[in-house]
Amino acid sequence: RDVQDIASIHKEKELGRLMELLALRTGNLLNVSNVSSDLGLDRETTEKYIAILERLFLVRRLPAWHRNRAKRLIRTPKIHVVDSGLAAMLNQLKTGDWISHSGDFGPVLESFVVQQLICQAGWLADDLNFSHYRDKEKVEVDLVIEQGRDVWGVEVKRAASFNTSDGAGLRKLAAQAGGRFKGGIL
């Protein structure tokens, strides 16, 4: 019903399928061409429907971080389902699946953490900018937080312990940000 108030949708069923597909890809890079192809929709319609889901606060595009601000505009964003419970339900994940389907929970956990940090930032007086980092070697940081020129990284892991290789993305981000890098959380 809210969808009809926001935009004229000609294929309501496809909008639901899109939401389900985005839930399956939460926490991953958003390739609109692949999504369009998988749903049998043209790219323009897919872009329009994703924008509608964003306006309904169901999904969030997390832009890519690059030290060159112009390059941020052309890098691939990640897609996150805003409600991690909805993402888990659409992924057909149950509480007991935490261990047996652990690979499926990682992206949902990442989306949860990203959304919680963005929501909590609303309480701050200073504006924060949020993005993700991924280089050509596919080394990534799940969340990059900027306050002015200062940069922090957050890497989400679904594990009780970690090893030094888990911090590779944070080290790469620190190298890219240089003196602007203020710290990271793993």
Predicted regions and their residues:
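Catalytic cores of nucleic-acid endonucleases
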Residues: R158-L186
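Conserved beta3 VAIK motif of the Hanks protein kinase fold
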Residues: V154
